[in-house]
Design a protein with these regions (language model features):
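Acidic, proline/glycine-rich low-complexity IDRs
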Residues: 1-172
Length: 172
């Protein structure tokens, strides 16, 4: 999973709360778990279609993001081994940009600003996901093999492994 839940005593009852991802602070919660479960279900579905096991990530861990990636229609997400601390190992970049300016933000900021990218954040280190118009169009594993592509917008992988225009799996 990507988040944690807390139990709160409210008027003599125990309620399950999730973090309030829309707030600036990581400490506030809300008395529901719907947002967390929706993201978790999407992540599990994505991993299942790729036949990949989940790798731990938490909503309050950090991701390095290039400023252009927040608004770009083409986005590349890739994960390296975490250097430790609160870093998840994830990077989010606009592959067409020449800037190398990155900012470190908590993963819940991705949930707020680009929620469509949340599905891929439980992939293990070494994986790369290329997004086109907000949807995954190609996934590469840690051996640089294309394990999924939609055939419409996926770029050619540096090491090959796929046939442009031919999907290996059904669309995600």
């Amino acid at each position: 999973g990507w988040t944690t839940f807390s139990l709160q005593a409210v008027r003599g009852r125990i309620e399950v709360w999730e973090p309030n991802y829309e707030q600036e602070t990581e400490r506030l919660g809300r008395p529901e778990i719907s947002a967390s479960l929706i993201v978790d279900a999407a992540q599990r579905s994505f991993l299942s279609k790729l036949s990949v096991d989940s790798f731990e990530v938490q909503y309050d861990q950090h991701i390095l993001v290039s400023s252009e990636a927040w608004e770009a229609s083409e986005v590349m997400l890739f994960r390296v081994e975490s250097p430790g601390g609160r870093m998840s190992g994830w990077r989010m970049v606009d592959p067409r940009s020449e800037t190398d300016t990155m900012e470190s933000v908590p993963l819940y900021e991705v949930y707020r600003r680009r929620p469509e990218f949340m599905v891929s954040l439980t992939l293990p280190p070494g994986y790369l996901v290329y997004y086109h118009a907000g949807a995954p169009s190609m996934v590469m594993d840690s051996a640089d093999h294309i394990i999924w592509e939609d055939g419409t917008a996926a770029p050619l992988a540096p090491t090959g492994g796929g046939t442009p225009g031919v999907a290996k799996l059904p669309p995600l």
